[in-house]
Amino acid sequence: MQKERIKTIDSLRGFSLLGILLANAVIYGYGLLDKSDLTNDKIEKIIKVITEGSFMPIFTFLFGYSLIKLVESLKRRNKQIKWLLVRRSMLILLGALHTTLWHGDVLLTYGIIGFLLLFIIERKPKILIIIGTSLFILSIVTNAQTMPLFLFGMVAVKKNVFVCLEQEYIWYKRGILLIPITMITKYISIMNYDNSWSVLLLNISSLLLAIGYITAFSLIYFHFSDMKVFKWFENIGKTSLTNYIMQTVIFVCGYRIGLFKILDSISLIFVALAIFSIQCFVSSLYLKKFKYGPLENSLRKWTYLSWKIRERSIKPFVIGRKNWMFSNTPRGARESAI
């Protein structure tokens, strides 16, 4: 059970990448799909309701979580926190390069905000909650969600949010109710996007839907963690940086050769699912030999000044309180994919 705690986070990160992939597929096909085809139009709107603006917040939240775990890892190795500056610099560089391929890049923003968070990373959870909540309220209007979501991810680790699922079960069940409610409000806002209130409603609904996804995924994982699909999500999550970049490369190549001009919305979804399935397969094979993905390992090399690709090892350890999501996992598995 201890190992499953971090696997939940890896699986959730992999799940978020699936949603991001589907959302980006619609974005790449925007303007190229035949709008006169009612089927195309309806499916595009359904995908927008399910994915747009609701999976990237999960990915961002987990980045904040991973940042704290990275700090803990550095401390265990008696490394100074300043090595995080090296990692952030590499992420900014990678993000800048990624921006040349995809205007929706988030890595550059993640790297820059990662620098800023170093000044408050040791603050008490109460301070982080106050700052995060204030920024979150502003983000509803400004749509600048990255910083508050980072902070909430950091707070989640510091507060051991998921320590006792049984005692908090009722809250997760209530969280699941957000899914149907916010999908309805997202649909209304998308159908009336020209109205001034629709953007505000869309931003709020998208974030609340992300919370619903997190609670639903956590509950399902808790009850059915042995299902093969969670292992696939986990492997994608452990190599999330590599897979995120590869998704962009594949989509850019497809766009350049005119693939999106000949596919309808249904075909586009199947292509996205095929890409994700291949990534699951390749990631699973790769992780049988190595502990980290290619890009993940490159960041580690620069961070720890270690140029040897280490093969997979199983050395369990315990940190702090026991907790079904966060503690007592193999060392390599605990560190951030980004």
Summary of predicted features, one role per range:
Residues M1-F326, G332-I338:
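Alpha-helical transmembrane segments and their immediate juxtamembrane cytosolic regions
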